[in-house]
Amino acid sequence: KIIQESSDKFGRANIVVSIDVKKIGDNKYEVYTHSGHQSTGINALEWVKTIAASGAGEILLTSIDREGTMNGYDLDLIRQVTDMVNIPVIANGGVGTLKHLVEGISIGNASAVAAASIFHFTDQSPIKAKAYMKVAGIDLRGIRKHLFGLHIFPCQHC
């Protein structure tokens, strides 16, 4: 109910619903709360449909199993969610390489990707990530590689 009321008041595009999901079996996922410590017993894929139908404008989808591991996104989960809803899905949880960011979009079909550990525990930066994704053919806003000395690909200003 709160999602629909918020969507009606502020507009669907302004409502992002965050879902923390844990894999509990083959292609079975459950919604968790309290930073991934408390099971709700709710089927995550059914909940995603409910959220989308209730007026959510975007979904921030976090795989609890992958979060902090740096082993890559749960691409099966992301793909299942993106295939069942017509709203943007932001993939979160598991990025350890720049390639993982690209995979979240190119394989998972996410509209956007989120990451943290890669930037805290490696020499990668958001600037390098944007440049890498652009080289991979992902259209990004705001990349200004020529200002940061990144010569990953030909630049008209370099």
Give names to the regions the model predicted:
Residues 1-61, 65-66:
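Conserved anion-binding
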Residues 40, 62, 67-70, 90-94, ...:
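Glycine- and other small-residue-rich loops at beta-strand/loop junctions that grip anionic moieties
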Residues 3-10, 102-144:
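C-terminal helical cap(s) of enzyme catalytic domains, especially alpha/beta-barrels
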Residues 41-45, 71-80:
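Charged helix-capping and loop-helix junction motifs
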Residues 1-4, 76-113:
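Catalytic cores of alpha/beta
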Residues 25, 69, 123:
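Glycine/Thr-rich phosphate-binding loops of Rossmann-like dinucleotide-binding domains
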Residues 143-158:
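Cysteine-cluster motifs in flexible loop/terminal segments that predominantly coordinate metals
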Residues 15-19, 59-61, 89-93, 111-115:
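Hydrophobic faces of well-ordered beta-strands that scaffold small-molecule active sites
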